[in-house]
C-alpha cells in the first residue's frame, strides 16, 4: 500500500509540473513567435526562437547524461522537439522547476541577470494570464 501511495504522489507531482511547463511554454511561444513554428529572427528560429548555441548546449547535456540522442539545427522548427529542448534545458539549469527562473533562463541563458531579463519576464507573465 505504501508503494502505491508513493507512486501516486510522484505521478501527481510530475503531472503538476508538466501542466506548469505547458502554460509557460504556451506563453513563451506567444511572446517569441506568436505561435509560429516557422518564425525566423536572425539566428533564432521556430516556435520558441531557439539559437544554435542552445542546440549545442542541449546536445552537451545529453552527452553528459550518456544519451545517444542529439538535436539538429533543423529540429528548432519542430514544435515537439523544441519543447523537448526546453524541458531538457530546464531540467539541467532549473532542476526545481521554478517558473520565474525558467522564463529568465530562456531569455538570458544560464548566466542571466534579473535586470537584463525583466522586460521579457513581464511579457511572458502577462501572456500567461
Describe the residue ranges of each PLM region.
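Sec-dependent N-terminal signal peptides
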Residues: 4-13
